[in-house]
Structure formats: structure tokens, C-alpha cells
């Protein structure tokens, strides 16, 4: 049997055995079960099939009960979602009808995953809960805190952000003022195109570990499923920006039609659930979550990839212009 290590950049170590099984070795150990192990078990138990099959895990028992590895079926794929989307954007400044159909399908698959995660259960870690006014206020307060930290961090390099402070707070405060609707559930927590795979003309979603910088307790927190949606929408923007940086020019609006197709697929597949905010509040919630994501991106790019700072800054300026 063959053994090889996956060499792409990641926060864990992945080893493929005989091109049939992949084991992820968890580098950052925390107390309790890793969220990927928990999420994989729940999704498998309740019939979600659009993910690599969970085969098992390794748990360190004793005083420190921790997941040290998770094992999945190794899936031979056409590409991951990031490579696929960048390829589509390179091929044409306007997404093709077939590409938009596949993006619409991706939205539907995410909605199906969220519907499974909203399955009634006696497990308190996964039982869906109604969103309360206190949740909306807490989320908005956290976003406003992140906004202050981000602008303080970026004000010297990106002085135009100072004028965005009040308009962005106004948008975030709309979230806090909503009448609560929809459910909060366990969700992916770190969703982007790189966490999806194209296989046999369909989509798989994987890597349910959540953001590695967060503790297990933080990663288990329930939230509106639109948090995952916001992450995917930002990934579309990054794929387009990557192609523009390669070409040295800003192309036509690739992202707009892609967003619309994804949201159309997601909302259509969610109609039979009570997961989402009421229709008139959907955009308010989603925009606040996108702002939260963009603020994180700006802090990350300033620390790790200064040449990419323009991507989140451009989004914030477009928000101010009402686009």
C-alpha cells in the first residue's frame, strides 16, 4: 500500500493511504471531541451524503479526552471549488450559463446540509434553537467591537476607512434592531470554496473543523446558517480578485451573477425549512455577516498579505456607496 502526505498549506497534517483513505492528524489539540468529528458523525447519522464518508477517528482517552485524528474516504475529484471557480473566471469575464447552474447547485447543497444540521435532536450540542433578540444584539455588539479594532489597526495604512466607521455601524445596528426570526444551528464555521470539491458532476462539502484559531467551545456556538453563506460569497469575491490581480486589470462583474445564482439555489432549497430570517430581513442579516467577514479579511491581509489589502477595502468602499 502507498502512503503520501498532502503538501498543500493547511493547519493540520493529512496523509493518504493507498489512495483510498485520508487521515487528518490534528496539530492543535483541545479538550474534548474535535468539531469535525462531532459534525461528521451527526451529518452521517442524519443522512447527509454530500461529503467524503467519515470512516473513523482516533481519540486520546484518559484525563485529557481529545480527538487526535479523523479518517475519511479519499475522494478522487475533478478539482476543489476554488480551482474550479478561478478557472471559470479566467475563462470569461461573464460566467457561462452552465457555470451559474453549477453555482446554483452548490447553494442547494449547502442548504441541504443546513437542513440536516437543523434536524430535531435530544443532543443539546446540535438541537436547533430559535434566534432571540439577545442573539442579534450580541452578534451586532461583537461586530461593532471588531470594526473599532480593525479601523484602529488599519487607519494609518488605509485612512479612508475612518469615514466608513459611522456608515458601517449604522448597517450593523440594523441587525440588532430586527424582530428575531429563523434558527441558530451548528454550522460549518469556516466555509469557502477551498472547502468544497467537484466530484462526478456534483458538490461535496468537507473540513468541518471550524476556524483553527478558535477554541472548540467557540467553534461549537450555534449561529444563523447565513454565516456560512456569507463566507462563500466572500470566497467568490476573492476568486475574482485573484484573476484580476493576475491580469493586472479589473474585469467585468463576474461576482454579481455568481452571488445571485448561489443565493437563488440556497434560498430555493431552504423554502421548506424555518431556518432563515424572514424575507424582508434576509439582506440585513446577510450584509452584517459579510461586513464581519470583510473586517476579518482586512486584519488578516494587513498581517499576512499586505498586497491583498485592497480586496477587503474595495468591498467596504462599495458598501458605503450602497453597491
Regions found by a protein language model. Name each.
Residues 249-253, 257-274, 284-323:
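ATP/Mg2+ or Mg2+-diphosphate-binding catalytic cores
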Residues 180-186, 199, 220, 285:
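Alpha-helical hydrophobic/aromatic positions enriched in membrane-embedded helices and signal peptides
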Amino acid at each position: 500500500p502507498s502512503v503520501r502526505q498532502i503538501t498543500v498549506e493547511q493547519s493540520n497534517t493529512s496523509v493518504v493511504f493507498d489512495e483510498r483513505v485520508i487521515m487528518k492528524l490534528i496539530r492543535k489539540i483541545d479538550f474534548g471531541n474535535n468539531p469535525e468529528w462531532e459534525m461528521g458523525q451527526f451529518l452521517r447519522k442524519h443522512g447527509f451524503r454530500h461529503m467524503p464518508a467519515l470512516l473513523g477517528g482516533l481519540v486520546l482517552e484518559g484525563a485529557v479526552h481529545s480527538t487526535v485524528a479523523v479518517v475519511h474516504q479519499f475522494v478522487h475529484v475533478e478539482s476543489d471549488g476554488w480551482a474550479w471557480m478561478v478557472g471559470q473566471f479566467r475563462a470569461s469575464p461573464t460566467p457561462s450559463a452552465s457555470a451559474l447552474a453549477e453555482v446554483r447547485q452548490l447553494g442547494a447543497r449547502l442548504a441541504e446540509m443546513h437542513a440536516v444540521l437543523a434536524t430535531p435532536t435530544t443532543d443539546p450540542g446540535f438541537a436547533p434553537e430559535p434566534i432571540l433578540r439577545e442573539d442579534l444584539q450580541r452578534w451586532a455588539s461583537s461586530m461593532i467591537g471588531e470594526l473599532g479594532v480593525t479601523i484602529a489597526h488599519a487607519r494609518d495604512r488605509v485612512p479612508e476607512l475612518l469615514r466608513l466607521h459611522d456608515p458601517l455601524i449604522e448597517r450593523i445596528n440594523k441587525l440588532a434592531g430586527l424582530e428575531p426570526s429563523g434558527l441558530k444551528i451548528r454550522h460549518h464555521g469556516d466555509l469557502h470554496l477551498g472547502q468544497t470539491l467537484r466530484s462526478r458532476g456534483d458538490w461535496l462539502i468537507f473540513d468541518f473543523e471550524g476556524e483553527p484559531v478558535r477554541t472548540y467551545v467557540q467553534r461549537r456556538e450555534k449561529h444563523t446558517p447565513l454565516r456560512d453563506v456569507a463566507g462563500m460569497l466572500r470566497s467568490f469575491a476573492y476568486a475574482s480578485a485573484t484573476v484580476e490581480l493576475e491580469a493586472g486589470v479589473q474585469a467585468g462583474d463576474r461576482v454579481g451573477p455568481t452571488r445571485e445564482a448561489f443565493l437563488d439555489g440556497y434560498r430555493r432549497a431552504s423554502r421548506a425549512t424555518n431556518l432563515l430570517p424572514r424575507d424582508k430581513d434576509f439582506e440585513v442579516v446577510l450584509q452584517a455577516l459579510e461586513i464581519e467577514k470583510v473586517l476579518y479579511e482586512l486584519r488578516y491581509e494587513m498581517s499576512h498579505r499586505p498586497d491583498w489589502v485592497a480586496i477587503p477595502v474595495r468591498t467596504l468602499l462599495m458598501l458605503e456607496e450602497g453597491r
